[in-house]
């Protein structure tokens, strides 16, 4: 099948069970990593019908978080679907990236555990815009990009109003390099004060 961005095999970090999870973290540390990022759910650009499904059992994520902590590393979780986010937050990840379909329960958990939300509004806008272009994405991806991309703005607004901690971030490889600063504009447009947006990237 067509692979848009390439999918890693077991040697690159696909884990099946706690033992694989420990090995993957240790291998990444050996390779020079100082942060671990997991895909707690599928993605908008995953070559699959849905980007919402959880991709880890909660105990696998917990094992990743605990092992990363042994090497003074935090864990960030790419996530779009609510169930995958909840598992990741309860397991102790430091941040949720994208968080598009975040629900009220997830926001409550994030506040309880002090988990940061990195909304990547620019990425949502980018994929939604490109979904309008015939042939830009494979047909299995295009409906997801058109549906999920625009929702990040609303999620950001709700999370901000709910008091979830928010950190600045874009999505390397999706929105264009060198245009990261546009994220500040989006954050202010959707509710933050200019100083809050600046502090989200610097504090």
Where do the language-model regions lie?
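Divalent-metal coordination cores built from histidine and acidic residues
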Residues: 1-73, 106-126, 130-134
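Short acidic active-site motifs
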Residues: 24, 83-84, 105-106, 154-155
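His/Asp/Glu-enriched, well-ordered alpha-helical/loop segment
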Residues: 70, 74, 139-140, 148-203
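Catalytic metal-binding/acid-base residues of hydrolase active sites
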Residues: 80, 122, 173
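Structural recognition of alpha->loop->beta junctions
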Residues: 86-106, 183-198
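Glycine-enriched alpha-helix->loop->beta-strand junction motifs that scaffold or abut catalytic
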Residues: 90-95, 111-116, 135-137, 163-165, ...
